[in-house]
């Protein structure tokens, strides 16, 4: 790479061919002398690559200075900093280059003098001209002393020897240059004065002519150079080519020289990027100004809403432009701090852009006020209650969320910005908004729905409508996530203010909503699902998943987006990422108390099922290898509607069926037309049911729950009618045993009893850890206490069914209690599961039985004591009537003994009541164990260890062809009512509408038992004793039966 002061090196005349670089150096050096007193680095093309000095440039006119570009005017300090490493290099190269330069310049002037003077000049004149040329050559040889003095002044600590050496070098340059000219031709001694004056004038005119020609050539080079050629200049140095790009330095000076060249390149690249950003920013601002000129006053509310949306989009664009402008201002400050000269046009453009951006911001604010006034005026004319009815006034600052509640309620926030609500009338505080409490209480009415999948879908649909999330498209939500910088931030945390900002940008796109109330309810719902501990922060992944699941969009598009959230750069997801996604999805039904019907809270079985469906071997899964799946594998698994996520496609079908009208009459409630789901029996001819009758499990005379049915969410076609008639005809010839032997399940069951180690908790940081279940004994105590309370108060839920405590809930509870070790000792097979449960349950039962036997022994001993006392207190003498005094004493003694006996009998009856309550618990527990054992027997009898386990989980079943079809929201499903899950939801707190999870403690069992109502005090003591003996015998028999069954199963 060469360092020149101009980008051209060719001269316009042959006389300038060998000195174009020198001419450029003279002109630029002259301009630097006028402006900042700086010099220029140059290297001649035909000479060595060492750094050479320039001779002093002649003075030029001020107009010539103004014609030069501004890049050629750096500060003196910048030039000194760049030239400082080359002092030693300059000293070594000075002696080798100065003589050649002076000799060429002398010959050049000699030729010019001969051509102009001609024959009229005498020998003396020629000699005088040569002497003049020698003098000029000496000046040229000793020129650049200005550069030397400047460098010597920068280094005041140099010794005097270096100064003397430089003087000697300068003197040798002058002598060598002068001697070079004298060797050509010696001047004659005698020359007339008039001729000498004429020759001097001629030579002066020639020199001035040459200087002018050189200046014109340099200026023509600048004028002919394009902006692209000139913008590469940095200060007084121009990067012309890459001569030194591959040069291998031979000494320290050359290495320092190349380092400076690299610094110049970096500065040049920064300047080019700076100019490029300015050009881009200028085009953005110009486009925004063009949009501003097209603004018109709104003529209607609809037009005002549309213009407000356009204004919001313009604001989003200008946000990016403002960020670019801030970067430019920071870069300009960096250049100034490092004494890098920024071109004047760039500074002017930057200042102009700052001014235009401020004017645009003011114009957008004024425009927003105009649109807000138009929306408010229309609202006043419509006579509304003061709430926002359109999004025309919602863009801008966030609304005051304190206005979302009305007296006597008050909204307050914690230190972590978590909202809570104060009821001044009852003097209570709640985490939930009053509207959310009413919503959750209203969901309790849906507990009458018999089947879990439809019950969960109905609840989610109610929440979706109340929060207006069904009016927000998934594309809008994704754009809002990206616009607020949430892309690729899924492992980080988001606080409540940021969530409110994102939700605000979503709700402003909806008309006729109470924006403040919707924001508060949405925040409340998200915190209930993902932050029940109210820490004030959730993961960004959870926030996105919670909104995408309930927003409007196609089902397959949601599946694809959810997979992209957890996929890596190779578009693959491993076990951990997949577990995080499924964990966040399962929290939605868990909040509604419906998680037991979908495989429980543990997501490991679902992950295992997905990997197996993708074709990954069981050995690879158990070996904790580095395995991952692609999008097609994930979609293929979801196409089968897995048990943990089956509620999501049911929700989509429910939303699609809301407006569907079927030209058929319900054979049970006689509704016509059927609105919503339509269920057609595939065994009974011309038998239809509406969704209400089907959900609540109603039945007709000839129709039974075991009959297969087909579900329609859209209007049927003639082809479907013919197909259903053919199916009904075929099913007429099939027996009941056939349907029991071939159950048709339309979802992919999750084998909870086969689960292995629990996956790691989805906790990205110590600040936010997911609550993990403690010892499962706590949940068992809660279950026992709730059942004992039901027995005590004599009431059970109206929505309970005989199968409400079936194997799904039990399997989930037992599997959660299994030790999750990392050494591979976790039970994987039904036999291991049974062995683990047997060891735990046997200890509990034996401990309870020992307590009961000990209490029974104490009661028997007390009973024998009472009997002996009663017998000993009776009179032994038959003639006791003869002694009246002794008779009276005996009667009084018997009366005291009777009172003691009554008191002890009362205590015994109370103890009997407690024993009976405990025995009821043991009997219930025994029935659960028997059901579990029966279930495990079925799993062992099957050849592949699964398949029929889904017959009791009960979600909509589907034909086999639907499993291979493309997932579709509006697909029809085959349903058998007897195969549907009838699990009851979790108990809801009637005070605040929450579904309780592990909200009780072990003391609740003791409290309920001590408050158990007792039987009548008139029962005699013998009945109490006999009942206790019978209860103990029943307990022993139950335990023996359980142990015997366990032994048989293990065999």
From Swiss-Prot:
Xref: Pfam families: EF-hand_2, EF-hand_3, ZZ
Zinc finger residue extent: ZZ-type: 661-717
Localization terms from the record: Cell membrane, Sarcolemma; Cytoplasm, Cytoskeleton
Membrane topology qualifier: Peripheral membrane protein
Tissue: Expressed predominantly in all body wall muscle fibers during embryogenesis and in third instar larvae. Expression is also seen in the embryonic and larval ventral midline and larval brain.
UniProt-listed PROSITE patterns: WW_DOMAIN_2 (PS50020), ZF_ZZ_1 (PS01357), ZF_ZZ_2 (PS50135)
Residues the record lists as binding Zn(2+) 2: 681, 684, 703, 707
Gene disruption: observed consequences: Flies exhibit muscle degeneration and lethality. Flies that have reduced expression of all isoforms (due to transgenic RNA interference targeting the common C-terminal region) exhibit severe muscle degeneration in larvae and adult flies. Muscles were either ruptured, absent or the fibers were detached from their attachment sites at tendon cells. These are necrotic, not apoptotic processes.
Composition skew (Basic residues), residue ranges: 85-94
Compositional bias ranges of the Acidic residues kind: 149-168, 182-191, 1012-1023
GO biological process: actin cytoskeleton organization; establishment of cell polarity; imaginal disc-derived wing vein morphogenesis; imaginal disc-derived wing vein specification; maintenance of presynaptic active zone structure; muscle cell cellular homeostasis; muscle cell development; muscle organ development
Occurrences of domain WW (ranges): 403-436
Composition skew (Low complexity), residue ranges: 129-139, 169-179, 1024-1042
Residues modified to Phosphoserine: 761
SMART domains: WW, ZnF_ZZ
This protein's UniProt keywords: Actin-binding, Calcium, Cell membrane, Cytoplasm, Cytoskeleton, Membrane, Metal-binding, Phosphoprotein, Zinc, Zinc-finger
Disulphide bridges: none
Residues reported in the UniProt entry to bind Zn(2+) 1: 666, 669, 690, 693
Amino acid composition bias (Polar residues), ranges on this chain: 1-12, 879-891, 962-993
Region called Disordered, residue ranges: 1-53, 85-106, 129-191, 376-406, 870-898, 941-1051
Gene3D superfamilies: 2.20.70.10, 3.30.60.90, EF-hand
Main location: membrane
Oligomeric form and interacting partners: Component of the dystrophin associated protein complex (DAPC). Interacts with Dg, via the Dg WW domain binding sites.
Described purpose of this protein according to its UniProt entry: Specifically required for survival and integrity of the larval musculature: the maintenance of appropriate synaptic retrograde communication and the stabilization of muscle cell architecture or physiology. May play a role in anchoring the cytoskeleton to the plasma membrane.
Protein name: Dystrophin, isoform E
Gene giving rise to this polypeptide: Dys
């Amino acid at each position: 790479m060469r360092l020149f002061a101009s980008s051209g090196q060719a001269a316009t005349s042959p006389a300038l061919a060998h000195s174009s670089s020198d001419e450029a150096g003279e002109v630029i050096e002259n301009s630097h002398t006028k402006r900042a007193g700086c010099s220029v680095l140059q290297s001649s093309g035909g000479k060595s690559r060492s750094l050479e000095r320039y001779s002093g440039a002649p003075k030029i006119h001020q107009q010539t200075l103004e014609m030069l570009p501004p890049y050629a005017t750096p500060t003196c300090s910048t030039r000194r900093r760049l030239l400082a490493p080359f002092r030693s290099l300059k000293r070594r190269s000075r002696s080798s280059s100065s003589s050649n330069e002076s000799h060429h310049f002398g010959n050049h002037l000699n030729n010019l003098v001969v051509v102009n003077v001609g024959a009229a000049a005498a020998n003396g004149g020629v000699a005088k001209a040569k002497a003049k040329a020698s003098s000029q050559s000496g000046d040229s040889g000793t020129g650049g002393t200005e550069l030397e003095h400047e460098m010597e002044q920068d280094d005041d600590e140099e010794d005097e020897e270096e100064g003397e050496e430089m003087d000697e070098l300068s003197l040798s340059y002058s002598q060598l240059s002068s001697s070079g000219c004298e060797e050509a031709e010696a001047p004659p001694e005698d020359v007339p004065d008039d001729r000498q004056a004429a020759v001097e004038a001629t030579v002066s005119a020639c020199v001035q002519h040459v200087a002018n020609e050189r200046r014109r050539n340099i200026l023509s080079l600048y004028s002919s150079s394009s902006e692209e050629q000139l913008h590469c200049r940095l200060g007084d140095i121009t990067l012309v080519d890459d001569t030194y790009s591959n040069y291998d330095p031979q000494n320290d000076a050359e290495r320092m020289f190349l380092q400076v060249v690299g610094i110049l390149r970096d500065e040049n690249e920064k300047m080019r990027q700076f100019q490029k950003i300015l050009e881009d920013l200028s085009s953005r601002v110009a486009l925004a100004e063009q949009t501003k000129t097209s603004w018109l006053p709104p003529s209607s509310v609809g037009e005002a809403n549309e213009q407000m949306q356009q204004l919001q989009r313009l604001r989003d664009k200008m946000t990016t432009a403002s960020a670019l402008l801030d970067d430019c201002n920071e870069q300009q400050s960096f250049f100034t701090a490092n004494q890098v000269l920024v071109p004047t046009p760039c500074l002017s453009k930057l200042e102009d852009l700052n001014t235009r951006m401020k004017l645009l911001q003011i114009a957008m604010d004024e425009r927003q006020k105009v649109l807000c006034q138009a929306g408010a005026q229309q609202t006043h004319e419509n006579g509304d209650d003061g709430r926002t009815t359109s999004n025309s006034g919602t863009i801008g600052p966030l609304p005051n969320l304190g206005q979302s509640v009305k007296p006597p309620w008050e909204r307050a926030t914690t230190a972590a910005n978590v909202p809570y609500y104060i009821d001044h009338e009852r003097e209570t505080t709640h985490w939930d908004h009053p509207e959310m409490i009413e919503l959750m209480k209203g969901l309790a009415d849906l507990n009458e729905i018999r089947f879990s999948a439809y019950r969960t879908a109905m609840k989610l649909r109610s929440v979706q409508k109340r929060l207006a999330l069904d009016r927000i498209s998934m594309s809008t939500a994704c754009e809002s996530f990206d616009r607020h910088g949430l892309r690729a931030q899924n492992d980080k945390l988001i606080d409540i203010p940021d969530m409110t900002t994102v939700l605000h940008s979503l709700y402003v796109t909806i008309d006729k909503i109470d924006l403040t109330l919707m924001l508060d309810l949405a925040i409340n719902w998200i915190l209930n699902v993902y932050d029940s501990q109210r820490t004030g922060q959730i993961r960004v992944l959870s926030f996105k998943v919670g909104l995408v699941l309930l927003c409007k969009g196609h089902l397959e598009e949601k599946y694809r987006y959810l997979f992209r959230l957890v996929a890596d750069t190779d578009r693959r997801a491993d076990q951990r990422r997949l577990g995080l996604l499924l964990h966040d999805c399962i929290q939605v039904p868990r909040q509604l108390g419906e998680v037991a019907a979908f495989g429980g809270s543990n997501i490991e079985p679902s992950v295992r099922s997905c990997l197996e469906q993708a074709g990954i071997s069981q050995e690879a899964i158990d070996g904790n290898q580095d395995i991952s799946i692609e999008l097609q594998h994930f979609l293929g698994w979801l196409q089968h509607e897995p048990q943990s996520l089956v509620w999501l496609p049911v929700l989509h079908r429910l939303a699609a069926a809301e407006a569907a009208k079927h030209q058929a009459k319900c054979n049970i409630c006689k509704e016509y037309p059927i609105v919503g789901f339509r269920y057609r029996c595939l065994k009974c001819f011309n038998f239809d049911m509406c969704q209400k009758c089907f959900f609540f499990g109603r039945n007709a005379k000839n129709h039974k729950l075991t009959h297969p049915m087909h579900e329609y969410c859209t209007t049927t076609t003639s082809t479907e009618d013919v197909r259903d008639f053919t199916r009904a005809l075929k099913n007429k010839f099939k027996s009941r045993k056939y349907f029991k032997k071939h159950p048709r399940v339309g979802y992919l069951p999750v084998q909870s009893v086969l689960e292995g180690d629990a996956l790691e908790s989805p906790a990205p940081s110590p600040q936010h850890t997911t609550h993990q279940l403690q010892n499962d004994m706590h949940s068992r105590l809660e279950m026992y206490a709730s059942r004992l309370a039901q027995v005590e108060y004599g009431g059970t839920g109206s929505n309970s069914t005989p199968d409400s405590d079936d194997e799904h809930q039990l399997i989930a509870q037992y599997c959660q209690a299994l030790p999750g070790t990392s050494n591979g000792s976790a039970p994987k097979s039904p036999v291991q599961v049974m062995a683990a449960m047997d060891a735990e349950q046997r200890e509990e039962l034996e401990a309870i039985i020992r307590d009961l036997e000990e209490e029974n022994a104490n009661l028997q001993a007390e009973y024998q004591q009472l009997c002996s006392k009663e017998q000993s207190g009776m009179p032994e003498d038959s003639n006791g009537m003869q002694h009246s005094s002794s008779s009276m004493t005996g009667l009084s003694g018997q009366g005291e003994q009777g009172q003691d006996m009554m008191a002890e009998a009362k205590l015994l009856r109370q103890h009997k009541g407690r024993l009976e309550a405990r025995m009821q618990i043991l009997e219930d527990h025994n029935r659960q164990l028997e059901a579990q054992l029966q279930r495990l027997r079925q799993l062992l009898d099957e050849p592949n260890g699964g398949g029929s386990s889904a017959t009791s989980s009960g979600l909509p079943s589907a034909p086999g062809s639907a499993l291979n079809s493309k997932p579709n929201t509006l697909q029809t499903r085959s349903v058998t009512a007897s195969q549907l899950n009838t699990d009851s939801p979790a108990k809801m707190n009637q005070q605040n509408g929450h579904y309780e999870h592990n909200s009780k403690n072990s003391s609740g069992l003791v409290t309920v038992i001590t408050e158990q109502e007792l039987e009548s005090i008139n029962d005699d003591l013998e009945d109490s004793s006999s009942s206790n003996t019978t209860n103990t015998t029943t307990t022993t028999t139950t335990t023996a039966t359980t142990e015997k069954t366990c032994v048989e199963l293990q065999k």
